[in-house]
Design a protein with these regions (language model features):
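Non-catalytic C-terminal accessory modules of carbohydrate-active enzymes
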Residues: 101-112, 125-153, 162-163, 172-174, ...
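Active-site acid/base region of carbohydrate-active enzymes
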Residues: 37, 134, 280-309, 315, ...
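Heptad-repeat amphipathic alpha-helical coiled-coil interaction surface used
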Residues: 404, 475, 479-482, 494, ...
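Alpha-helix capping and helix-loop boundary segments enriched in small/acidic/polar residues
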Residues: 5-11, 29, 55-59, 69-71, ...
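Compact, charge-rich alpha-helical regulatory domains located at protein termini
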Residues: 731-804
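Extracellular/oxidizing-compartment recognition motifs
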Residues: 1-328, 336, 353-356, 369-371, ...
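Alpha-helical support elements that line or immediately flank enzyme active sites
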Residues: 28-32, 207-224, 271, 337-365, ...
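C-terminal capping/lid segments that line or modulate ligand- or cofactor-binding pockets
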Residues: 80, 149-150, 329-330, 348, ...
Length: 805
């Protein structure tokens, strides 16, 4: 019997107290947990440095407990105090103004303090009725709404506790705790509205700390926000989340820090009768304590900032669960976001145990509530989340396989195989129910969520046919589950899934690809999925069709959550390197660098979370810290920088950078379970190209040299390898008579030559209603007046002199 304690239900944010004597103690170990979340102190000193313990999972399945060595905190007479806040267990949680008390409505805790004395004897102090309880000065402790703390409060009496057994299964954590990552100092702003605002210079997740300068009874209110509007404080995008810290001072000089909440923010509005000093305030950045494994940079400052933004969004949203956003009244473990970003996350940090726990969350939801299927988000709040549908529910397939490829842990793959198998079997049964055509599904899916080719500007559903997306992800689920079965020696499963995947592919081809090789759908995401999953008769023909689609879109991306994470990978794999660079490095809306030029320090939820005039979009759903679109960094790491894992656990990698002169240098170092991989490349001033590769002990690499005049590639073993040559392509002089006019317009030097040499054609190209910018210089024989075509004569030769910096 595990004996927990609780007190009168009217006591909000209670403190549980145990006093005891201890002499000549050799070692003291505290095992402890609490629901919702707890903070423990022994003799006035904090126990451990974890935040938001015990963390978030489905508490009906298990409750995690933490273990701390508290020997150094012991005195002769001791007082252990444990304060509880609502957390995920009791607090407001869910979409919009979500309900409270998903798992319970009573605070409770369990603890066991094991004392080993110098004479070898032992004593165990457990939660029982010898403990006392009292009210705390924490008046509100909500994950969404923040914390209200009154340090003038003194509990009038101590209350008895009730010992009971709630029947919870206690379990040691498998994932790392939430810790402080770093700390940020703000600058002080006075807005046009007269508001006092702290700017931390970086959007992040965490809590606020300040040095208390207030006299007794004085209040300070700190409210958080992500962006300014018109230079003034703004927080409407948080929806119903108050996200604030209200503090009433006891007049004691000390550090004051929130303990039972977290916020996603960059700016803090300060309401206080007294003047403040920015140096008294600190932004405490919180994230699951994952080892950073990636070091990389390029010669392109905005691309470097994009990679850093993706990292900050991962830090902000990896708080025990991979959430979608850290700021508004949501903060849920959305499965679609998680699967899209998983590969990128595993590059950035050691995510194995973090994802192990999330796969446990998925498995609990799958078996308890969804009969083999998977939810939109996990934990699912006791099955109240809807079915995830294609792409989202496929987190149960993509994440286990991604984790296996990065870490090569066959035991973990075996542990997660039932998750993969049962979800795949649900898809197969759905297929059978619909006649086993392998194509048409009639269930909900978010599709290409937030794509820009929907029915209207505010549409959340993209233009790619949902049945096609469902069919493609059905194919992927069967294929990857078959691969997992093959790895695990489950031959019967493997053979069945391999045959079925071939049948599904054939059915999808019959439905969506003509005999002549044309795709029946004409969206960017449709081409991405077809090329990614081998749905073509002729790959080059399908790639050419995608190129034409991009051209009709003026090389602006239109993809959403399904297509965008894969877009650049597909383009680069299909040899559409110019197109990939053009989209990635575009500074115009929509695009990744557009966000940065509009002040982004994390990845946005929507391409237009901020409009071009700086206003927050009127879509009613705008998070400025959403990592899903940060998955583009995977293409940067694996294709542009050129370091790609091709066998489980990084035993073999492919080094095949896709190079253009817009990026002159690249360097990446990746710590893996097999050692540290390094690759760096550079375009010299004379146009020569150099590549260096460092292969860890016991590993091999397949090296493909970009634009080598002899199409050189080779396999190499451990050690250092260096290559230098003059490439067949002139990376530094990209313009000639075949140049794309859009590329010319985006290069200031080339655009100036264009304007001087062909002023009329230049003006037409800059006309937003003209399609000239989507043409190449050698394609002006149609759709352009003859007089303007003549202006282009000799322009290509002049443009050859333009050299990329």
């Amino acid at each position: 019997m595990m004996q927990w304690i609780r007190t009168d239900s009217s006591v909000q944010q209670p403190v549980f107290i145990r006093r005891f004597s201890a002499h000549c103690v050799l070692r003291a170990v505290l095992e402890i947990t609490g629901l919702g979340i707890y903070r423990a102190e022994l003799n006035g000193k904090r126990v451990g440095n974890d935040y938001l313990t015990p963390g978030w999972n489905d508490y009906d399945a298990y409750v995690r407990f933490q273990t701390y060595d508290v020997t150094a905190l012991l005195e002769t007479e001791n007082e252990l105090r444990v304060t509880l806040g609502e957390g995920w267990y009791m607090g407001r949680l869910g979409m919009s103004s979500g309900p409270m008390h998903h798992w319970g409505d009573r605070f409770m805790m369990w603890a066991r303090l094991s004392l080993t004395y110098q004479d070898g004897t032992e004593q165990v102090i457990e939660t029982d009725e010898d403990w006392k309880a009292c009210a705390s000065g924490i008046l509100m402790a909500s994950l969404y709404d923040g914390e209200h703390r009154d340090d003038t409060f003194k509990a009038s009496e101590e209350l008895p506790v009730e010992a009971f057994d709630p029947g919870y299964c206690l379990k040691k954590p498998v994932s790392p705790p939430i810790h402080i990552v770093t700390e940020l100092k703000p600058t002080l702003l006075t807005t046009p509205a007269g508001e006092t605002v702290l700017d931390f210079g970086q959007n992040f997740s965490g809590v606020l700390r300040f040095e208390n300068f207030l006299p007794f009874g004085e209040k300070i209110l700190l409210q958080t926000g992500e962006v300014l509007q018109g230079g003034c404080f703004y927080r409407e995008n948080l929806l119903t989340a108050k996200s604030e810290f209200l503090y009433v001072s006891d007049g004691v000089r000390k550090s004051v820090e929130e303990a039972f909440t977290f916020h996603g923010f960059r700016y803090v509005k300060v309401t206080c009768r007294l003047d403040i000093r920015p140096e008294d305030f600190t932004g405490v950045v919180l994230s699951s304590d994952l080892k950073e494994t990636l070091r990389c940079e390029t010669s392109h400052p905005l691309l470097n900032r994009l990679m850093e933004n993706a990292r900050w969004s991962r830090l902000s949203n990896f708080l025990d669960v991979p959430t979608d956003c850290p700021q508004r009244d949501e903060r849920l473990g959305w499965t679609g976001d998680a699967q899209a970003f998983a590969d990128t996350a595993c590059f950035q940090a050691d995510c194995k145990d973090f994802y192990r726990k999330y796969m446990e969350d998925l498995r609990i939801d799958q078996t308890r509530y969804y009969h083999g299927d998977l939810p939109m988000f996990s934990p699912s709040l006791r099955g109240t989340a809807g079915i995830g549908g294609a792409v989202w529910a496929d987190a149960g397939i993509v994440i286990p396989w991604t984790v296996y490829m990065h870490y090569g842990d066959e035991a973990l793959l075996r542990e997660s195989y039932p998750l993969m198998r049962d979800y795949t079997e649900v898809r197969i049964q759905k297929d059978r129910d619909l006649g086993f055509t392998h194509v048409l599904f009639d269930e909900f899916t978010f599709g290409d969520w937030l794509a820009l080719d929907g029915l209207s500007r505010k549409s959340v559903f993209g233009g790619t046919e949902e049945c096609f997306i469902q069919g493609v992800y059905y194919l992927q689920a069967v294929e990857l589950t078959g691969k997992a079965a093959r790895v695990l020696g489950k031959t019967e499963d493997a053979e069945r899934y391999e045959q079925l995947s071939a049948d599904i592919r054939n059915s999808l081809m019959q439905e969506y690809v003509t005999d002549g090789g044309r795709l029946a759908l004409d969206t960017q995401t449709a081409y991405v999925l077809a090329l990614q999953h081998g749905l073509y008769h002729d790959r080059q023909k399908m790639a050419d069709a995608m190129k034409r689609r991009l051209r009709r879109d003026f090389y602006a991306l239109r993809c959403g959550f399904t297509g965008a994470p894969l877009l650049l990978n597909v383009l680069l794999d299909c040899g559409l390197v110019d197109e990939a660079y053009r989209i990635l490095l575009s500074e115009e809306y929509p695009g990744w660098l557009y966000e940065i030029l509009h002040g982004a320090t994390t990845i946005w939820e929507r391409w237009n979370s901020l409009e071009e005039d700086g206003r927050v979009s009127d879509t009613g759903m705008d998070s400025f810290n959403h990592y899903a679109y940060g998955a583009v960094c995977n293409a940067v790491y694996t294709r542009i920088m050129g370091l790609r894992c091709v066998s489980p656990g990084w035993k073999k990698a492919e080094i095949a950078p896709k190079v253009r002169g817009a990026i002159r240098r690249s360097r990446i170092e990746q710590e893996t379970v097999s050692g540290t991989w390094k690759t760096a490349w550079e375009i010299a001033d004379d146009g020569s190209f150099s590549l260096s590769v460092s292969v860890p002990h016991g590993c091999t690499a397949h090296v493909v040299l970009p634009d080598h005049p002899e199409a050189f590639e080779e396999d190499v073993g451990e050690g250092e390898h260096r290559y230098q040559y003059m490439p067949a392509r002139d990376y530094l002089h990209p313009f000639d008579e075949h140049a794309l006019i859009l590329d010319i317009m985006r290069n200031p030097q080339a655009d100036a030559i264009f304007a001087e040499h062909a002023p009329g054609l230049h003006a037409l190209a800059w006309d937003p209603d003209s399609d000239v910018r989507a043409k190449h210089l050698d394609e002006l024989s149609w759709g352009v007046p003859r007089a303007l075509r003549a202006q282009a004569d000799g322009l290509g030769e002049k443009l050859r002199k333009v050299e990329l910096a």
